[in-house]
């Protein structure tokens, strides 16, 4: 009985170890799945960042086009203002020379000179404003180009990160497939072990049943032996008594 119990305990321990390994395999598979989900999430985030960076690059490109168009218009206005300034300067010079050479001219000529001076002042203001706008546009263009360069760098970094995450996802996928195959094999082994354990347990129960039956049979036989021994003792006692009676009868016959 102790040997059977020991074998049953060993089989139970083996089953516990197998179940523990199965739980560990499932936990590792779940961890691998969680890791794959995390990598997918990071990949989606990097793709979103790359799309945002590409959208930002496109917006900056549109801004550059608008700024360049504004710069071209400003340059055209600057050219026109410069031309007007040159013309006004020439006219002012001519007017000044005419004023100096013809101080006795009529009030109309003086008004003409004043008008030309006013045009010169206006042309100077226009030219200065055009210069300021040109400098502002050039500064904005430099800032936009710098933003575009940084956005392109971020987009390139995002693409590199996506490549790394895709490679990591591939590795995790392969590990997950390996764990799934291992889990399937372990499940098959577990089913085989459980079937063997059920068979052995059934045989053990049959052996225990036979042992109990044999033990009851031994007890019955022991009782029968005890009964027969008691009957043998009684029979010996009867034989002894009968022998004594025969001897006594023989003695009585011989004495008579």
Swiss-Prot record:
<feature type="coiled-coil region">
    <location>
        <begin position="1"/>
        <end position="256"/>
    </location>
</feature>
<dbReference type="GO" id="GO:0007015">
    <property type="term" value="P:actin filament organization"/>
</dbReference>
<comment type="function">
    <text>Tropomyosin, in association with the troponin complex, plays a central role in the calcium dependent regulation of muscle contraction. Involved in muscle actin filament organization and muscle arm extension and morphology. Also has a role in male mating behavior by regulating the copulatory spicules. Binds to F-actin.</text>
</comment>
<feature type="compositionally biased region" description="Basic and acidic residues">
    <location>
        <begin position="24"/>
        <end position="52"/>
    </location>
</feature>
<dbReference type="Pfam" id="PF00261">
    <property type="entry name" value="Tropomyosin"/>
</dbReference>
<keyword id="KW-0963">Cytoplasm</keyword>
<dbReference type="GO" id="GO:0005737">
    <property type="term" value="C:cytoplasm"/>
</dbReference>
<dbReference type="GO" id="GO:0006936">
    <property type="term" value="P:muscle contraction"/>
</dbReference>
<feature type="compositionally biased region" description="Basic and acidic residues">
    <location>
        <begin position="91"/>
        <end position="114"/>
    </location>
</feature>
<comment type="similarity">
    <text>Belongs to the tropomyosin family.</text>
</comment>
<keyword id="KW-0175">Coiled coil</keyword>
<feature type="region of interest" description="Disordered">
    <location>
        <begin position="85"/>
        <end position="116"/>
    </location>
</feature>
<dbReference type="InterPro" id="IPR000533">
    <property type="entry name" value="Tropomyosin"/>
</dbReference>
<dbReference type="GO" id="GO:0051015">
    <property type="term" value="F:actin filament binding"/>
</dbReference>
<dbReference type="GO" id="GO:0005884">
    <property type="term" value="C:actin filament"/>
</dbReference>
<protein>
    <recommendedName>
        <fullName>Tropomyosin</fullName>
    </recommendedName>
</protein>
<keyword id="KW-0009">Actin-binding</keyword>
<keyword id="KW-0514">Muscle protein</keyword>
<feature type="region of interest" description="Disordered">
    <location>
        <begin position="23"/>
        <end position="53"/>
    </location>
</feature>
